[in-house]
């Protein structure tokens, strides 16, 4: 009996040890799984850019073409395009057609919805172009494609919102074109980062119809932020959503006038603002910026102010924002003079180069 007793205890001890081992392994696997699921949403905070060489920067400057952008991308947008108008539809078709013509293989979607305005229900359509929808993380560049409704003018003129925001739309289209071969490598190169991609968002309904208020403004961004917050990402996920996939939300607005100054609005994205400053200095030092007398002409200083714009619905949900809007605003803001004649092509060309270098560095391309 004694021998059998020792055998039973040994067996019991073995079983208990095995059970504890299995429990430990299982718990470890579950914990590791949860951490793996959660960790990718934290990678944005430690993400580091790959700084381009002088040769890489010169290649960017050589590939971008502001005259081509002006003719092919900007001119078709310089029309009246308030939500629901024929011009709004034409501009959306133009944006989609330009992106779909590229080799990188963008996935283009429209987020169409009905929103209540002071003039009753109107239809709005955001455009979301994603380079690699299966990537967990997205660098987002955004602007609004609609124009403010100013009504008929006695001289027959219409408001075309050149800086607000036809030029930012054209800048994103030119970026996608100029960097097409580089962006294509995200999908095809084994050295690319499959978990990091680029997304371009063109919002509808940024402008107020009557007077800016929480309910009469930001129609498209309010709708899309809410939709992304309730959409699982990656597909099938149970505890992460599309909003969490946004590494950095870069919003362009009121760009195109001469001598803009862009302050840093948010301390938590200061390191990315600092990269823009560094890129501007480097391009200046290489003599690749036109009519640019100072190495820190565009991106300078901090501000305590907060400007209401399409980033607000995302900011309130915890998304990191880099807001590229000049302060002070262009003198032509919300006037009929916000037209092509008051744009400054060398400034737009310079900002194209800075933004394109920034994107390549962020995406480690």
Task: Describe each PLM feature range.
Residues 128-130, 138-142, 199-202, 247-253, ...:
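Structural recognition of the beta-strand scaffold that forms the well-ordered cores
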Residues 83, 248, 254-365:
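Active-site-adjacent substrate-binding region
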Residues 56-64, 77-89, 113-118, 154-166, ...:
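Second-shell loop/turn segments in exported
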Residues 69-76, 86, 90-103, 167, ...:
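Extracytoplasmic/secreted proteins, especially bacterial periplasmic and envelope-associated proteins
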Residues 1-19:
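Classical eukaryotic N-terminal signal peptides for Sec-dependent ER targeting/secretion
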